[in-house]
Amino acid sequence: MAEFPEKKDNLVIENIQPSVDANRFAIKREPGDTVKITADIFRHSHEKYDAAILYKLRSEKRFRKAPMHFVDNDMWAGEFTVNSIGYYDYKVIAWTIDPKDTPTESPLMELRVDPVYARTGTWYEMWPKSQGKDPKKSATFKDCEARLDYIADMGFDTIYLVPIHPIGVTNRKGANNALHAKTDKNGNPLEPGCPYAVGNKFGGHFAVDPELGTLKDFEHFAKAARAKGLRLALDIALNCSPDHPYAKKHPEWFYHEPDGTIKFAENPPKKYEDIYPFDYYNKNFKALWKEIRDIILFWADKGIEIFRIDNPHTKPFPFWEWLIREIKEVRPELVFLAEAFTRPKMMHRLAKEGFDMSYTYFAWREQKWEFEQYFKELTQTNAKEYMRGILFPTTPDIFPKYLANQGPAQFRQRYFLAGTLSSLTGMYNGYELCENIPSPVKEELLDSEKYQYKVHDWDSPVNIRD
């Protein structure tokens, strides 16, 4: 039997825009933005009515009111300006002049206001171990500090650091991704390994690699960077080498083979024998999730404002929604970048779940029609409400064929495109030197610093920094 209505609503409020998946996810803005809202509002008779937007920062007690006006065909529009970062709640309300009528309200909707540097920034990707002058040993944070003026003078406002933690010894990779690093006669590795294999006897995600220096050295570097107007981003690789303290202390946090051994990582077609992936739904998963939250907050306290997350598409969506909200509710100034070169719908979902920025397919776009099609998708569809794309011409994992063995003109052209197609752009260190020798077997640079110490000639005559 049909139920009688509990509320005598005489007005209909529907089709509120903008909206992300019928208000399942928040729309995103930055301080100073004007948020423009439209809604279809109508009723069954000719009685006059009015409408407004009620909005507030979630921490505020009272809603503020912004008027709406009739546009056409039952569409109403209004706007309000946001000046503080954090989560906002808003809704549309409509009412008639009849005092007996109860105002009609839409469901509460969510808006997230992120720092301006979530929308605009120029990044310089720094591999700390490659900032020195000796190809046989690691550079230090002091060497990195010596390069700050060079980076600031190029106009960058953000230094993005790859993982700075201790690197595993077991199954350590060698130069050019060789399965095993070279060792001395006692079996000690002679190569640094990959920084994404986090953890050894010196610690894990809360520690720094002793080759780079101490935690105090890092804090000094961070302070010096801030003094130069440079923000710091840190690469968070949620992987553990077999030598990571977690492997012994929390074996339940990992996947296991049928024989009980911890399972190595795979990201088909790639295999990573030097790292273990976390099992995000293990029997003690809440402790794991909280530990990862604490890693982020630890480095935020040390001066990191942006977190570039490695391979987020290989972790569960609910984890990201929980983690980013959990952190932003207490530290709304922190920003997250999704490093997910994967299927489009997967990338869009990560942005909806809360990532402030996303890597893009820019590196593989070459033809005019490809650029037009792709950037229309990012800027002229609903994606603009939740996805902010950052453009890197190259990365340590991607060296496109059109730059292979090419000269300064091609390198300038690609960076010019990156800098004009998005308000977020980045450069991998060495790009300004037009380093152009490709790997014969992969879409990467030969002799990648992912697996070896590397010395760059920052004063090379082909440097295009000017």
Ranges and model annotations:
Residues 2-15, 30-58, 62-230, 239-241:
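N-terminal structural segment of carbohydrate-active enzymes
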Residues 13-16, 27, 37, 41, ...:
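Weak global preference for isoleucine
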Residues 16-22:
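Short, solvent-exposed loop/edge segments of extracellular or virion-exposed proteins
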Residues 23-29:
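Short beta-strand segments of immunoglobulin-like
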Residues 27, 109-112, 294, 378-379:
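Hydrophobic alpha-helical segments with strong N-terminal bias
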Residues 125-127, 160-162, 233-237, 310, ...:
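A cross-family glycoside hydrolase active-site/sugar-binding cleft signature
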Residues 195-202, 206-219, 223, 230, ...:
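Alpha-amylase-like alpha-glycosidases and glucanotransferases acting on alpha-linked glucans and related
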